[in-house]
């Protein structure tokens, strides 16, 4: 069923990691998951395989990757690192970890300082990743529909989009072949999982 995520690889990696887990470990998932998966799927799996208890023996956080291939290090410095824990203490530990290993660009355009942003729970961090990628998916699809319409009525869509994006409430992407890639078309379906 293409509407459901295939967790087999993540499950196998989690089992392998959990079999070797030692007390005091911080586990961080850096991927894209349906909301609730870190807590509802991976916490119980880690506990079952390791025999340890999350929040007491180890901590789990979800911290989505927000980088593009070919510009990973630049993106790590450019964008806030989102961290959501399964417990307050685990989230604080995850924040301290990422603050210790990442450096961030100065950005005056953000609502708060660039750096590690605690999300108040793994579910909020999972949803943030889905929301930003779904926004991109919808925006690309919308731009493509504008282009189709403009072509049908003889209007230069590039000029229209440039005009729309001249004010701060519009962020229309450029139209292209379609919404593509290995991730963006798939992520909106994770709301249904």
Predicted feature residues:
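Structural/interface elements that position substrates and couple domains in central-metabolism enzymes
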Residues: 1-193
């Amino acid at each position: 069923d293409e509407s459901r995520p295939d967790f087999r690889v993540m499950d196998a990696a989690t089992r392998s990691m959990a079999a070797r887990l030692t007390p005091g470990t911080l586990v961080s998932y850096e991927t894209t998951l349906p909301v609730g998966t870190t807590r509802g799927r991976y916490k119980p799996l880690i506990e079952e395989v390791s025999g340890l208890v999350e929040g007491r023996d180890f901590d789990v956080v979800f911290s989505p990757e927000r980088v593009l291939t070919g510009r990973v290090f630049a993106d790590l410095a450019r964008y806030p690192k989102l961290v959501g824990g399964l417990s307050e203490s685990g989230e604080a530990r995850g924040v301290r970890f990422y603050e210790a290993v990442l450096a961030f660009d100065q950005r005056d355009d953000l609502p708060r300082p660039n750096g590690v942003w605690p999300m108040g729970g793994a579910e909020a961090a999972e949803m943030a990743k889905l929301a930003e990628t779904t926004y991109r998916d919808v925006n690309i699809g919308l731009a493509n529909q504008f282009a189709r319409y403009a072509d049908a009525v003889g209007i230069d869509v590039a000029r229209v989009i440039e005009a729309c994006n001249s004010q701060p409430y519009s962020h229309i992407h450029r139209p292209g072949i379609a919404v593509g890639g290995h991730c963006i078309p798939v992520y909106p379906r994770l709301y249904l999982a």
